[in-house]
Amino acid sequence: MVKMLVLYYSAYGYMEQMAKAAAEGAREGGAEVTLKRVPELVPEEVAKASHYKIDQEAPIATPGELADYDAIIIGTATRYGMMASQMKNFLDQTGGLWAKGALINKVGSVMVSTATQHGGAELALISTQWQMQHHGMIIVPLSYAYREQMGNDVVRGGAPYGMTTTADGDGSRQPSAQELDGARFQGRRVAEITAKLHG
């Protein structure tokens, strides 16, 4: 059975919802899934004052455990067109894994959230994939296999590179049913492709 990690960073809970949906989809695809998050870097008093969702259930991951999985889906908030510093800080600690080639031929995939439709989602998806490529990981994107990302009638999440959600910073827009469906699709797709590669 494929072992998958869904690893995320979420300040306000939007990516937490997407990560849970991706984990559901991966389980539907036959994977054994672990859901974890990266540590928060913002001081607790600042996080509370900014209304961060600090009561998230998922345990904190450690960089060394990434080698224990066949596939890793990263979900991160976007900051100025890049992954959040919390995720970058975590990935910057994987140099030891890189030196050993511990993630070579593992499967990787990415999802992101932004506060606006044009908040740099695609750039954040691609730049996070670069981190995985430096490790020799095999990238599995959302791709246009997920057709529900097409259309301009409503705000829709998704890009060929990975699933996205646009969630307003004030909480007035949460991930939509379509965006959560896309996250489940991506999780299932990654699980099924990983099974073909590592099964």
Swiss-Prot record:
Compositional bias of kind Polar residues: 163-177
Family matches, as InterPro entries: Flavodoxin/NO_synth (IPR008254), Flavoprotein-like_sf (IPR029039), Flavoprotein_WrbA-like (IPR010089), FMN_Rdtase-like_dom (IPR005025), NQO (IPR037513)
Residue span of region Disordered: 158-181
Enzyme class: oxidoreductase
Positions of FMN binding: 10-15, 78-80, 113-119, 134
GO molecular function terms noted in the UniProt entry: flavin adenine dinucleotide binding; FMN binding; NAD binding; NADH:ubiquinone reductase (non-electrogenic) activity; NADP binding; NADPH dehydrogenase (quinone) activity
The UniProt record lists the keyword NADP: yes
Binding locations of NAD(+): Y12
Gene Ontology cellular component annotations, sorted alphabetically: membrane
Enzyme Commission number: 1.6.5.2
Descriptive protein name: NAD(P)H dehydrogenase (quinone)
Gene source species: Brucella melitensis biotype 1 (strain ATCC 23456 / CCUG 17765 / NCTC 10094 / 16M)
Organism taxonomic ancestry: Bacteria, Pseudomonadati, Pseudomonadota, Alphaproteobacteria, Hyphomicrobiales
